[in-house]
Amino acid sequence: MVKLTQRLGGLVLRFAAFCAALGAVIAMITSRERSSFFVISLVAKYSDLAAFKYFVIANAIVTVYSFLVLFLPKESLLWKFVVVLDLMVTMLLTSSLSAAVAVAQVGKRGNANAGWLPICGQVPRFCDQITGALIAGLVALVLYVFLLIFSIHHVVDPFLLRKS
């Protein structure tokens, strides 16, 4: 019964992480807004910024990985390798979220020292959608941290309980 509960808990966490990463990808990809000021037209889209592209690619990789691991049989020897992959995915999510948040912060507040003006006043819907994508990415990251702890415990625990 305990093994079934552990397996089910891991699957629920993985499915939630899959949904969060997929939501982050969808929210980021669909973020686009056009704004005009007299004769000047501004089009804001995620693909204009490398950090946002990286965020989309990283979360897409996490989405595919999460989906594939959901169907991994519980008897498979690959579960020991899943711990390593979970660690890599957690690091990938951390780096992509950090880069995207840094760029979003500059977009929201600007940088007076560099002479960069904030754009969220001109394209608020775009900025709100980016914020939603970043929140979904943060949720995916937190879930993957829990999954990493869960995976380490699941793989290492039998070795700790073994009698010598």
Curated annotation (Swiss-Prot):
All ranges on the Cytoplasmic side of the membrane: 1-8, 73-80, 151-164
Subcellular location: Cell membrane
Transmembrane segment boundaries: 9-29, 52-72, 81-101, 130-150
Membrane topology: Multi-pass membrane protein
Pfam families on file: CASP_dom
One term under GO cellular component: plasma membrane
Keyword Nucleus set for record: no
Residue ranges annotated as Extracellular topological domain: 30-51, 102-129
Keywords per UniProt: Cell membrane, Membrane, Transmembrane, Transmembrane helix
Subunit: Homodimer and heterodimers.
Record-linked NCBIfam families: A_tha_TIGR01569
Family designation: Belongs to the Casparian strip membrane proteins (CASP) family.
Entry protein name: CASP-like protein 1C2
Protein source organism: Arabidopsis lyrata subsp. lyrata (Lyre-leaved rock-cress)
